[in-house]
């Protein structure tokens, strides 16, 4: 009965005592063992055990008060007493509680201080009361968590409770001492354990008084049979150390220790099993209590880690469209689009890639970032970003082509195929890399665009074309918002109509084959197809010949550095003079084209782009240097930028005069140079400014391309064909060949000014320029050889570029018409700078539409103006992308002449005017 009662009444005073005691016993045992081993001889435990066994068995059972005590829940009584004392604002200490119990319950035996302390600790543990230096207080919702924190502070709940109660109990008697003692207890488990033991002993004394209490105590103290003796011995130390309460405990324990131990022992034995069970239950309850106590804390912690399901539900409720599925779908779509684009580029670039991978990979290794940026650019729509993430294989493959590969190497290596090609490519790639690193955002934007408009995806090249045009008409904006403009460019590159149409027009298989056969540079141009497809290469060479002499000086070193054909570059320059019609082209391109570009993109890069135009000339080392210098000039000052620009521009004028038969080619070369410059500058500038330049080049390409197309009207028709084919095949290696070819072809073009043969010969430069425009699609860029170009065409078809091919056919026809008009306009443009500027404004307007139009998906109706814009943009992009392409164009004498034409008067102002002319030509062609 008593056992049952005690178990049942645990929550009553005895039961709570017992529960606490049971826990205490368990604790006491571990603590006691620790304490015994630490401070007490083993003998104490045995003695205690013996004492418990002998005297403890009978006394607790025989105690009469037990029945009453069991029925009197000490814990509840204490709670009532504490509540009453709190209401009376009396400090609740153990002594005060004893007095209160004695006063309020005169007939009930007063519990010993040890029992009282133990019960108070139990209540604290149960969070019914909480101790403070001022005494105990009833726990309220506001103070409910004070106890847990107190308990948590202590190493053990029991000890904490004990210590805390000690504080409270001693607070009124000895608040200062007690508080430190409590702290000490918390610090020293040994003392608290001793306290527990003492408490148990005290409880045992009380148990002697109250059988039930004693039994309960014994049950709990059974854990610590030895504990009481050690407690007695240790208590003095504990008293001083832990608290006065401890001292009380010690005193109590020492007095009734023997009897209590015996009674405890008996009670523990009697109730040991039941208490163990109860203890286990209590421990479970105790643990169960802990979670409730901690639940709020857990809840507080949980919000920081909301379950995935809940989080997703919240997201769904906030934005139903924003789901993991949708996000994954979006990501998958973007990946698919990029993969399609990459496949497209790879389809035509697989061969290119093998060839290009040999050199380009070396370059990539040296300029992995450049390549990455190239990819970014491709994604962005910049051919120089052929290695763009979107189309990593695209540009790379373009470079890979034996011919295209040289340009790629040009982008990556200075030594491959003449430093001007390689250096330019290197610079291009580096430039792409450094600027492109920022442009990765653009690639992301392109991915977004693709996600938004997946169908434009087919027009990778067209996206480049659109990007170029976007750059052209947004050149000023680019100065302000290069990043945003790049995003726009990419979005434009998303337009299928622009890239595909341009690519189709320029990249007809005929054009590809023609370009390939015509000039190795064409592949570079093809590679550069992004914005500076081929005009960029021609311009690259011209760029190398900032002046004729300058180009020779620079271009020769560059070519020598490239070891492709220094003489080729020089020859190109000089053959450029031979086809000074090409110089006319150069004039038109450098002065008008660049002017158009600069005028068109009057942003900081207008002169820089012009300056850059010569740099593509030197895709060779000189191109790289020029490009770098051009970039530096771009960065340093418009004057410096204009200086190469001016040099080129005079050549442009010189060449423009001879442009008679070769005027178209010269213009094409000039455009190519401008494009090459713009593109090369972008590639060369491995700096943020390079990015700007590239962006500027894109815009300028838009300007340059139409001009280039116009200039290379004759060569552009064939150029578009041969360019398309030669573009992919023109690499850095091809560029020297192109230079050689272009030199004779430029000579021929000089003789023929605009004859198809010149166009064919000049495709590296002029045709490439025209091809560049059409070769906006990365596929063309990917194709590195003439075969690569043809493959590129096929690849585009494979990539679903049939529309592009058709568009390219249309674009080619338009481009031819435009080039014819442009050729006709070429003389005009030099003459009518103001008209050209007006045209430039018109073209800027038309460029906006054309950038829309050029993308084969969105504005299939292409105005010649848009074609010109795209061509310039593509040529520029190609030139930027493929330094070799620029040299390929540069390979054409006109291109170099363009650069060589260093008309001081044709500097910034003339450049601006000539861009106006270029714009006018573009508008007129439209």
UniProtKB/Swiss-Prot annotation:
Bias-annotated ranges (Basic and acidic residues): 18-32, 379-393, 473-495, 633-658, 684-693, 785-799
**Pfam family of the protein (one):** Stork_head
Q: Where is the sequence biased in composition, kind Polar residues?
A: 518-529, 746-769, 847-884, 914-926
Q: Which InterPro entries match?
A: Storkhead-box_winged-helix, STOX1/2
Superkingdom as given in the UniProt entry: Eukaryota
User: Which GO biological process entries does UniProt record here?
Assistant: embryo development ending in birth or egg hatching; maternal placenta development; regulation of transcription by RNA polymerase II; response to bacterium
Instruction: List the residue ranges of the region (Disordered).
Output: 1-32, 338-393, 452-529, 564-586, 633-693, 723-802, 823-926
Compositionally biased, Basic residues: which spans? 353-378, 463-472
Q: Which PANTHER family match?
A: STORKHEAD-BOX PROTEIN 2, WINGED HELIX DOMAIN-CONTAINING PROTEIN
Q: What is this protein called?
A: Storkhead-box protein 2
